[in-house]
Each structure stands twice: as structure tokens, then as C-alpha cells.
Curated annotation (Swiss-Prot):
Residues 55-113 are annotated as: DWL domain. Its main location: secreted. This is Crinkler effector protein 1. It comes from Phytophthora infestans (Potato late blight agent). Glycans are attached at residues 23, 37, 265. One of its GO terms (cellular component) is host cell. Belongs to the Crinkler effector family. Residues 1-17 form the signal peptide.
């Protein structure tokens, strides 16, 4: 939603605000302006002419309330918003374009911006000669080009959050978008101090090379049973800053970044596909805190969505001492999280988890309640057949009053055909 301050040309007085979605069109803005001034604007909304309140045809400085307080009549240096179907985000009226945080000085000097000048036709429906530029309807090609440009620019500008920046509110957005239920089972973990924790090198960050070499050696040593089988290996990915980058319509926002280590099934490893064979994604912290959990959840979600078939990864957030926080999808729309205290129990859990789908799967540790199962996101939340087509259709519907009815009906039929074709029971009709 964007707030646009508008002024009627030839009328002295204060600017008035109009709240509107930046993805709405110029035609929608005309409707909103007329509705806001129903008693003073009596013509049809389509007969209004709108100008971008920036000099030099939209390339110069924006007009302020001080500039127009006594009325304005000359629009020759302003850009006409003459295409009714043009999205506001494409004509200089996006939230980013109009963002302005006024100071007290701005308010006192009336240096607050005006965004749109409105020309109301005279009673006989005419508009002065200098304001008579024609407004032509959009062609099918123009509508599709405009929509594609909006979507492309939206994707390019979409916020991509680093995993390390994820917080509890963002985790809640992921959970809500994916319709997840969180399961925190009661674990009666036995005391087992047979494996000591890792001694971090003081005053050196986790990602520094010598620190990485140290914790990789520790993990290699205590996952020796798995690695000696010949079908598992540890992969240090801390230096690959984009391996978990993801943009997916099933998520509320894009995410970017990496983790520290992957445990990979060697038989499926592919040098060209980084996540081939991934069984466990590990994030290491010198000190694990509650605020780190959203990062681990984001890494699990990304890894699960990006991993090839037959990969069912878990996530581990750990300090390699007394915090071993595991996350995985245990059933449809169920996100299970377990925190263990002792390294020995954690390594036993890892072994049972990653071997769970093999013929030599050991029984799950006795302290784990119930049966152990892992699935991936695609098993309960498949990728939309054509998310872009769905979004495009939504935008066409919003522009129903400015596109030809025949064009809109054709797009509806195309979209419906795509939906039917995606249904397995009807797919044979289209092969």
C-alpha cells in the first residue's frame, strides 16, 4: 500500500491523500481520486487526467505542497499518466519512488511532496488544448509486456534474507506459509560423557580456516563409523556463500547463504550438484542461543527444497559441546525439533537418522520417543505447477476494468486449462 498526495489543477488548497496498492493501475487511481472527492469531482473517473508531479517530464525534482498551495495551472513540464492500464509501480509511483520521511522543518516549510496533479474536465467535458493528450487503451501485447516487466522487476528487487539474519518473526512466517505444525517431543536423554566436547580456538571466529580444520577433524573422528562404511563423507561448505540460496513460491521470502558442513551419502555425491546425497546440514556456533534456531530452520527448509530426489536431510545447530539441536520434517506439515546435551547421544542419533532408509539401518536410540521418520518438503508441499501463471492471472483480474472482456476470458480459459492439465486424473487428455 502506498499513500499518494494529490492536488487538483487550478484549485488552491491542501493536498489530499489517496491510499492505493502500488500494483494497481492508473485507472484504479482515477477511481480512488474521484471517490475521495465525490462532492467536487462530478465527471466520470475515466475523464480525469493525471500528471506525475515532477518537473522535466518526470525526470526533475518533485513538486511540494508549498509549490502548489496557491494553485497550479501549467502542466506542460509534467509527465502525463496517459495509459489507464499502466501499473503505478511502472510510472514513478511505487512505494520506493514516493518514500519520504519528513522532518519538523519540512512540515513547517510545507516542503512535503505532492505526487499527482489532477486535471478535472470542464462541465462540457472538454479539456484545455495543452492538456488534451489522448489516452489510448492498452493492446494485448502491451498488457502482457507490462505485467511481465512488473513481475521481473519484483523478482529482481525481492528481499533475500541471509540465514544469519532470520529471526523468530521470520521463522513464524515460514511456518505459516508452509502450514507447518511444530512438534517438540519429550526426550529422556541418558547421561553419557564418554565423548568430550570440542575445544574451540579462543578469539577466532567459527569460519576462520584453522577453526574449520579443527572442527572438521572432530566431526571426522566421531562420525568414523559412518565414514568408514565408505558411503558417507563430510563436506566443508562454509566458503560456498550461495549453496543454499533459494527463491521459491512456497516461501514467504527469498533466502540466501550457506551453512558450515554437509554430511553426504558418497554414492549419490555429484561434483556438479552440491546437494546431491545430502543427509545432514550442520550450522556451528561457539555458543548456541535461542535466536540461532530460525537460521537452522531456514537452512533445513532450503536444503530440503533444493536437494534431489531420495535425499531427506536433517538440520543440526550445535556448539559441539552441550547443545545439539536437530530439526527435520517427520510427517506431512510436521516440523520436529529435538535438543540433546551429550555428544555421544548426538552422534548415535546422527548415525540412526542418516541410515534410516538403508538396509543396514540401526534401531533409533532408546531415548527417542516413537518411530523415527524423515520426509522432505516436496512430499507434502509440491511446487506449484505454474506459480507465475497464477500470479499473472491475479493481476489480470485486478485490471478487469481496463482490458478487453474477450482478452480476460481467453486468459481465464488458458489458466483453467493449465490447472486441469496438472491434475493426474485428467493429464491423459493432454498427452
Amino acid at each position: 500500500m502506498v499513500t499518494l498526495y494529490c492536488v487538483v489543477v487550478g484549485v488552491a488548497g491542501s493536498a489530499f491523500p489517496v491510499d492505493i496498492d502500488e500494483n494497481k493501475s492508473v485507472g484504479h487511481l482515477k477511481d480512488a481520486i474521484k471517490e475521495k472527492n465525490a462532492s467536487t469531482i462530478t465527471c466520470d473517473a475515466k475523464n480525469l487526467q493525471l500528471f506525475l508531479a515532477k518537473k522535466k517530464k518526470g525526470a526533475g525534482v518533485r513538486l511540494t505542497e508549498n509549490d502548489v498551495k496557491d494553485g497550479v495551472s501549467d502542466t506542460s513540464d509534467l509527465k502525463l499518466l496517459g495509459v489507464a492500464g499502466a501499473p503505478l509501480s511502472l510510472v514513478g509511483l511505487s512505494e520506493k519512488d514516493v518514500k519520504f520521511v519528513p522532518t519538523l522543518e519540512d512540515v513547517e516549510s510545507m516542503n512535503t511532496p505532492v505526487h499527482v496533479l489532477v486535471v478535472v474536465p470542464e462541465q462540457d467535458g472538454t479539456i484545455s488544448k495543452e492538456m488534451s493528450a489522448a489516452t489510448s487503451p492498452l493492446t494485448v501485447e502491451q498488457v502482457e509486456m507490462s505485467m511481465n516487466k512488473v513481475l521481473r522487476e519484483r523478482d529482481e528487487k525481492a528481499s533475500a534474507y541471509s540465514f544469519s539474519d532470520l529471526n523468530t518473526a521470520m521463522e513464524e512466517r515460514i511456518v505459516k506459509k508452509m502450514r507447518l505444525t511444530e512438534n517438540i517431543p519429550d526426550v529422556k536423554e541418558p547421561v553419557d560423557t564418554s565423548i568430550a566436547g570440542y575445544s574451540w580456538i579462543p578469539k577466532i571466529v567459527e569460519s576462520e580456516e584453522s577453526q574449520r580444520a579443527g572442527y572438521m577433524e572432530y566431526l571426522q573422528q566421531h562420525l568414523k563409523t559412518l565414514i568408514d562404511r565408505g558411503d558417507f563423507l563430510l563436506d566443508d561448505i562454509a566458503g560456498d556463500k550461495s549453496v543454499l540460496n533459494i527463491v521459491d513460491p512456497r516461501l514467504p521470502f527469498a533466502m540466501k547463504g550457506t551453512a558450515d558442513v554437509l554430511l553426504i551419502n558418497r554414492t549419490a555425491k555429484n561434483p556438479l550438484i552440491k546437494l546431491a546425497g545430502v543427509s545432514l546440514v550442520i550450522e556451528l556456533k561457539k555458543k548456541v542461543e535461542p535466536g540461532h534456531v530460525p537460521q537452522a530452520i531456514g537452512q533445513l527448509v532450503s536444503c530440503s527444497m533444493k536437494a534431489p530426489l531420495n535425499c531427506y536431510p536433517l538440520s543440526l545447530l550445535t556448539d559441539l559441546n552441550d547443545h545439539w539441536h536437530f530439526s527435520w520434517f517427520s510427517d506431512k506439515h510436521v516440523l520436529t525439533q529435538v535438543t540433546l546435551k551429550y555428544p555421544k547421544n548426538a552422534f548415535r542419533f546422527i548415525e540412526a537418522a542418516v541410515l534410516g532408509r538403508t538396509d543396514s539401518a540401526p534401531p533409533p536410540p532408546s531415548f527417542m520417543p516413537g518411530s523415527f521418520k524423515t520426509i522432505k518438503v516436496d512430499d507434502f508441499l509440491p511446487q506449484p505447477v505454474d506459480a507465475r501463471a497464477e500470479e499473472m492471472m491475479e493481476r489480470y483480474e485486478l485490471m478487469a476494468d481496463v482490458v478487453e472482456p474477450e482478452f480476460l476470458m481467453a486468459r481465464r480459459m488458458d489458466y483453467a486449462r493449465q490447472l486441469v492439465q496438472s491434475m493426474p486424473m485428467y493429464s491423459y487428455m493432454y498427452t
